């Protein structure tokens, strides 16, 4: 089958590989019907994901049809349309039982697909722990609609969940790409007092104005002053940084009030340094 493969830093190639087979009784084989590119794939290409293994098929955002299942898989069957979770997790270790599935201690736990084991930029993919990592797609939901569920929407949901958002809060979201919009949708479920989205792309700003007219928007250059003028305590109560640039990492702290919650949703190509306290709000 054709696969898109991480060869070395800066180099991906379309390569021929054998179809995957069941290795563990908890595995499933999924025929990929639709996949998308994540910015994390670009971080792998840039060499900024240390655990990424050269030679693996990249891709962790996909939907498909279950082709085969191991003997211990009970939640899905061949022929089911499914989303594939970016995280593979055993569901049994300490971290899984406490909801921190990204830290699953199994060798295939956490972000394995498309990073440490072959992922979904291929015709077929083997999914470990299929009962945890596959979800059936309802008949009325298209593959295109479901494609966001396994990673981008789940990332936004998790970010909103851990940010302890309260109804009296001013929430700043930095970045309005696909993950930023999904984060916005999940933050809206928390009903904070106001939501501000910082974005430089005019098309993305227009999209927010058309679909979510109640949301405030601001450019990065004006963001710090705008947030201070449109918040109750000299800065945002909660900041979610989804853009992933060095400048936006710094901006997150500049816009946060004292004792705010800053949630880093993005990945970065290099280590970031917290700004000096004197230079922020």
Language-model features, listed with the residues they occupy:
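Glycine-rich cofactor phosphate-binding loops and adjacent beta1-alpha1 units
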Residues: 163, 188, 205-279
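Short glycine-centered segments of the SAM/dcSAM-binding site in methyltransferase folds
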Residues: 81, 170, 260-261
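Short Gly/Pro-enriched turn/cap motifs at secondary-structure boundaries
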Residues: 7, 19-20, 53-59, 113-118, ...
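Mid-domain Rossmann-like dinucleotide-binding core that forms the NAD(H)/NADP(H) cofactor-binding site
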Residues: 136-225
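Short, flexible surface segments
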Residues: 75-78, 167, 258
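Glycine-rich beta-strand-centered segment in the early N-terminal region that forms part
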Residues: 20-35, 48-97, 138-141
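NAD(P)H dinucleotide-binding glycine-rich loop of Rossmann-like/cofactor-binding domains
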Residues: 92-174
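Cytochrome P450 core scaffold surrounding the K-helix E-X-X-R motif
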Residues: 40-46
């Amino acid at each position: 089958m054709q696969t898109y493969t991480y060869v070395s830093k800066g180099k991906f190639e379309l390569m021929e590989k054998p179809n995957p087979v069941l290795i563990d009784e908890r595995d499933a084989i999924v025929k990929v019907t639709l996949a998308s590119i994540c910015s994390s794939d670009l971080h792998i290409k840039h060499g900024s994901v240390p655990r990424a293994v050269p030679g693996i098929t990249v891709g962790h955002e996909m939907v498909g049809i279950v082709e085969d299942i191991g003997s211990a898989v009970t939640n899905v069957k061949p022929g089911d349309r499914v989303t594939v979770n970016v995280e593979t997790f055993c569901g049994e270790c300490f971290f899984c039982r406490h909801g921190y599935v990204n830290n699953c201690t199994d060798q295939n736990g956490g972000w394995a697909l498309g990073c440490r084991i072959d992922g979904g930029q291929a015709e077929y993919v083997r999914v470990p722990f299929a009962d945890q990592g596959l979800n059936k797609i309802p008949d009325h939901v298209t593959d295109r609609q479901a494609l966001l569920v396994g990673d981008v929407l789940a990332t936004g949901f998790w970010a909103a969940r851990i940010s302890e958002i309260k109804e009296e809060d001013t929430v700043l979201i930095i970045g309005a790409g696909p993950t930023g919009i999904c984060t916005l949708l999940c933050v809206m479920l928390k009903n904070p007092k106001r939501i501000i989205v910082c974005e430089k792309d005019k098309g993305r700003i227009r999209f927010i104005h058309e679909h979510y007219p109640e949301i405030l928007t601001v450019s990065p250059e004006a963001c710090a002053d705008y947030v201070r003028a449109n918040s109750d305590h000299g800065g945002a109560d909660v900041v979610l940084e989804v853009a992933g640039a060095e400048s936006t990492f710094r901006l997150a702290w500049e816009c946060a009030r004292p004792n705010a919650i800053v949630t880093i949703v993005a990945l970065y190509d290099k280590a970031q340094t917290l700004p000096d306290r004197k230079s922020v709000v």
